[in-house]
Amino acid sequence: EVIATEGRAKYNENVKHNDRDIYKGLTFWSPNVNIFRDPRWGRGHETYGEDPYLTGKLGTAFVKGLQGDGAYMKAAACAKHFAVHSGPEALRHEFDARPTEKDLRETYLPAFEMLVKDAGVETIMGAYNRVAGEPSCGSDKLQSILRGEWGFQGHFVSDCWAIRDFHTGHMVTSTAEESAALAINHGCDLNCGSTYLYVQKACEDGLVSEEKITEAAARLFTTRYLLGLFDETEFDQLSYLEVESGEHLARAEKAAAESFVLLKNNGILPLKKEKLHTIGIIGPNADSRKALIGNYHGTASRYVTVQEGLQDYLGDSVRVLTSVGCDICKDRVEGLASADYRLSEARSVAEHSD
């Protein structure tokens, strides 16, 4: 709800400045309800974890909060990436996922089904990979499940440049025209990328009909109508006063605090300031803003790293020593240094901390 409110407020401000560029709309490509079972997958932090049922329940709550239950949607949510997309990142543009029907139905589809049936999610984003030989953004099987079995009524969008992958990675088509036609003919209404610039030529060549193109356009305009973009709505007066308001920050802090699971403590937490003299913080994320925001982030007025948070809490009475220790993925923090050159610093911080 907070995300949708602030999104509407920013949208209203952008419209006043006639700014309708990328990332300025009301269709939010979230949540990511892919199943995260391999920690090497670089986008796992976007997901709700390894459990299909829990992922579906959390995703359903997110979609309901984002879209609201008023006369108009406050924002349009998007369940992604449909389907069987959980890495590997390096191969996703050519990879063919071939799960058993049991694994498909029990692992990879339940969360999407819940978001369609229980939350009425407005948008589905197709994945880069193929599923059983068919590209996810041009799949008879996936569309028959999505619209035929589940009754999905919203619009379907490709992941960015996924349709180009048809002829450059998956090699299921030979030209951009063929790729555009295959996608539209199989229910992909919107292309994130440039391949749909070839739709007119594909139509002229008889690869896709005007009826199919009209069907796709109608679904996209239906989303706009549901958002109230052609009418006056209850959200039109939301202003920048909503952005990072005290209430919203408090709700964000509460949600973050309630998400923590403390697996082991040994009497360390909560920190007792009166008994501490020196604290050591060791690791590449000790003072990293990137670790806080991840990818696809907005602009916050203030970021509080682990180091800064401890300094704020402990004040001047407790020394806070920090060492990066190592890089996230390389063997050195700085290019000109020797491998593991920060280890001695990390040891010193540890030795001189309580």
Model regions and ranges:
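Glycoside hydrolase catalytic-domain context in secreted enzymes
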Residues: 1-354
